[in-house]
Amino acid sequence: MNKVINNVFAREILDSRGYPTIEVEIELCDGAIGRASVPSGASTGKLEVLELRDQDEKRYCGKGVLKAVQAVNGIIADEIIGMNAADQNAIDKALIELDGTKNKSKLGANATLGVSLAVAKAAANSFKMPLYRYLGGKQTSVMPVPLINIINGGVHADNKLDFQEFMILPVGAETFSEAIRISAEVFHNLRSILKKKGYSTNVGDEGGFAPNIESTEEALDLIIYVIESAGYSAQSDFALGLDVASSTFYEDGIYKFEHRDLTSEELTEYYCNLVERYPIISIEDAMSEDDYEGWKLLTAKLGSKIQLVGDDLFVTNCELICKGIEEKMANAVLIKPNQIGTLTETFAAIEMAKSNGYKAVVSHRSGETEDTTISHIAVASNCGQIKTGSLSRSDRLAKYNELIRIESALGKDAKYYRGLAWVL
């Protein structure tokens, strides 16, 4: 009886870009409280569930979320007060049925996710368990490799780079804490080198630097130099990752990339060339979400060599993941809880990926909050990878710091993920 939901309350707060988002608090009959806030993306997939905004230009440039807040404080509260917070499946099923639409357009996925996450946190607190243990059980022990965004481009930055993210993966570290330490050293070395070269050291939405670099190769060469001049190897200590976000420069079947018009075949050959020349082990959204043939070609060419992550292609949706598996598109799935709208559906997407030999990468969004739930999801699911921005901006560091705490709590049971060895 103590796990029964007694009170539900939502409010409007601000995300890392200064735009409104929703925060939800759930209180149980035993006094346990769970609080969760919801992120927002800039580069979004067409088939993501709906983020409900007010569209009132007189408030927050139309981006207010009072409608979502009202949905939580009204119709959702009426439905779930009195329910058992420990039955996450039942809570999420009630939210899905209450919304009644395929894309959660009635209540908004920001409303449903805020409630779903807050309920899980309240239940975990009631059981006096850390969230990762409550969600993952006793077998939870794998600390994820972070995919750390150190150079921003695309829609995340105001520069000439078409690719959205250039990432370092500290695959050679022994522990998560060591992974963060060596990555921070590389990050600060990059800042110093950019400053010496006369580049801006301002950071983008996700905390990476956004210098006015001319080309992809120039960015990759710079990162290799920065890693090695920091005293590390770009072969054994670190590997590289890219988030291309190719849908942003895909038009009428052509990729308009660096002043060139490329077909899917030509872009695939370009990636093959990059992989030969640089220690790249992960490429996200290498093809547009609409370019299925391009995805199939790319997967056939590079799928046995590196990790090919589908974000816009899959949008954390089991139906789309299943289709991708059947048609041999990509070999990994990016997991963003706000793309699907409930915790249960998020874990279902992770399980579908893993059970079919695909890897799962838990991810933040470009508009974040100080909420650290994704850190717990990454550990609870044993998925082994997390993408949560750079080593600046407190909204990104909150996730890394929480993972350091989790590793400390796990003690000798903590195991740093080694599942990327197949691509080294």
UniProtKB/Swiss-Prot annotation:
It is an enzyme of class 4 (lyase). Disulfide bonds: none annotated. Belongs to the enolase family. It comes from the Bacteria. The keyword Lyase applies. It is found in: Cytoplasm; Secreted; Cell surface. InterPro entries: Enolase, Enolase-like_C_sf, Enolase-like_N, Enolase_C, Enolase_CS, Enolase_N. SUPFAM superfamilies: Enolase C-terminal domain-like, Enolase N-terminal domain-like. The keyword Secreted applies. Its EC number is 4.2.1.11. Pathway: Carbohydrate degradation; glycolysis; pyruvate from D-glyceraldehyde 3-phosphate: step 4/5. Keywords: Cytoplasm, Glycolysis, Lyase, Magnesium, Metal-binding, Secreted. Mg(2+) binds at D243, E284, D311. GO terms for cellular component: cell surface; extracellular region; phosphopyruvate hydratase complex. GO terms for biological process: glycolytic process. GO terms for molecular function: magnesium ion binding; phosphopyruvate hydratase activity. This is Enolase. The gene is eno. Gene3D superfamilies: Enolase-like C-terminal domain (3.20.20.120), Enolase-like, N-terminal domain (3.30.390.10). Its cofactor is Mg(2+). NCBIfam families: eno (TIGR01060). It comes from Wolbachia pipientis wMel. The active site is at E206 (proton donor), K336 (proton acceptor). It catalyses: (2R)-2-phosphoglycerate = phosphoenolpyruvate + H2O.
